[in-house]
């Protein structure tokens, strides 16, 4: 049996302000730092050990991973960064308040933008300063690989090659893997692992800063999965994520 641990980054400044974040590179709040540290403590108390960690190229996930590893006294672990683990790109919604958008367009439309599988938000213009095509961290990518908007289907399409080429081989080689990423890049992996339908994925919400453990069989099929920590607190945190897009 293999184990895989996924952690969504701790609360960010734009989570706190209820803004669509996407590829915008924002900081953790003090609460987010505490959540990341608590994740590390839970992993240490549970006796978890890791051989390699993966994260995105966005600092809210990078710092979450670092704070968790610091609590485990494992900051020396090798870490692989990939843009493929970035949050879903929210296009022209990036930086806008979710509640304000719900008041303007209705809760149902914002839910579609936030959670539907194949409906992307309105795209950014290519020269919009909120975009990332001039960002040095993406300089080696083709322009079309740096999105102007994404739906979850698009996110799955970029996450799965990294899973298949890097993460899955590491697990199968016996390495114990920790991934710190984002709500939608984790939803993409969970959808794939659990075989969640396109329709049902709308109901999946990933809480900030809570370790999600997968026990996998020899074919990397889930035996079971569970969050570490207090079940009631985890459920409340997931419900809070679900309510972010309401007026």
From Swiss-Prot:
SUPFAM superfamilies (alphabetical): Phosphoglycerate mutase-like (SSF53254)
Keyword terms, alphabetized: Gluconeogenesis, Glycolysis, Isomerase
GO terms classed as biological process: gluconeogenesis; glycolytic process
Source organism, top-level taxon: Bacteria
UniProt site (Transition state stabilizer): 182
Pfam family membership, one: His_Phos_1
PROSITE patterns found in the cross-reference section: PG_MUTASE
Assembly information from the UniProt record: Homodimer.
Protein function: Catalyzes the interconversion of 2-phosphoglycerate and 3-phosphoglycerate.
Protein name: 2,3-bisphosphoglycerate-dependent phosphoglycerate mutase
Protein species of origin: Leptothrix cholodnii (strain ATCC 51168 / LMG 8142 / SP-6)
Gene, per the UniProt record: gpmA
